[in-house]
């Protein structure tokens, strides 16, 4: 019995970009898929109306536009919402679940970077590093010393939320003998 082959199609899945994402990632999306962007659309409503019947995927970022039920319901072919972020708080997850739309994110992608920055900002604030830098650059050190600053070692650190990032911050704070509250 002969094997029937499905004809290859040149039709690319269509993607709606609703928030800015990392430029190299956007370039790959545009090379692989037919991409429509709301970012610079002069008439967002008209663009959505025009492309809605063909959109398979919506792509967004954590700091970007939210994906609400109303938009999902306008896109009858929508199968996936891809979030280039750790959090999903900008997506109506209940609506996506109810409408059978998969939602993805990028957990752990920036956990270490965010934790490192949090510790760096804590040190910069408590030790007044930016102010001390300005003091030295302005030549004020010739007139006297910069005021003493506070140490962080042995202090108590309050962390709101002990998810991946909170735990990574706590591990780093342990190196400063900090108590976690």
PLM region descriptions:
Residues 3-5, 139-150:
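A short, basic/flexible loop-to-alpha-helix module at the beginning of a structural domain
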Residues 28, 117, 121, 168, ...:
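Rossmann-fold NAD(P)-dependent oxidoreductase module
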Residues 16, 80-82, 102-104, 158, ...:
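Structural detector of well-ordered beta-strand residues that form the stable sheet scaffold
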Residues 34-36, 102, 179:
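Conserved beta-strand segments of alpha/beta enzyme cores
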Residues 1-62:
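N-terminal glycine-/charge-rich "phosphate-binding" loop or analogous flexible N-terminal tail
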Residues 10-11, 31, 146-181:
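Rossmann-like dinucleotide/phosphate-binding beta-alpha-beta segment
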Residues 6-8, 26-27, 49, 94-95, ...:
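Short secondary-structure boundary/capping segments
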């Amino acid at each position: 019995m002969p094997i029937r082959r499905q004809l290859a199609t040149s039709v690319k899945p269509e993607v709606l970009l609703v928030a800015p994402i990392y430029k190299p990632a956007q370039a790959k999306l545009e090379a692989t898929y037919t991409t429509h962007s709301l970012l610079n659309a002069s008439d967002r409503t008209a663009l959505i109306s025009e492309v809605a019947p063909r959109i398979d995927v919506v792509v967004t970022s954590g700091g970007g536009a939210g994906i609400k039920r109303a938009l999902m319901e306008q896109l009858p072919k929508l199968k996936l919402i891809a979030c280039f972020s750790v959090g999903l708080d900008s997506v109506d997850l209940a609506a996506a679940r109810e409408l059978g739309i998969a939602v993805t994110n990028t957990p752990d992608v920036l956990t270490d970077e965010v934790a490192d920055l949090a510790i760096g900002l804590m040190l910069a604030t408590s030790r007044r590093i930016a102010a001390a830098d300005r003091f030295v650059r302005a030549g004020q050190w010739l007139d006297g010393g910069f005021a003493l600053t506070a140490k962080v070692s042995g202090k108590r650190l309050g962390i709101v939320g002990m998810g991946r990032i909170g735990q990574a911050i706590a591990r780093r704070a342990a190196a400063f003998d900090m108590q976690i509250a």
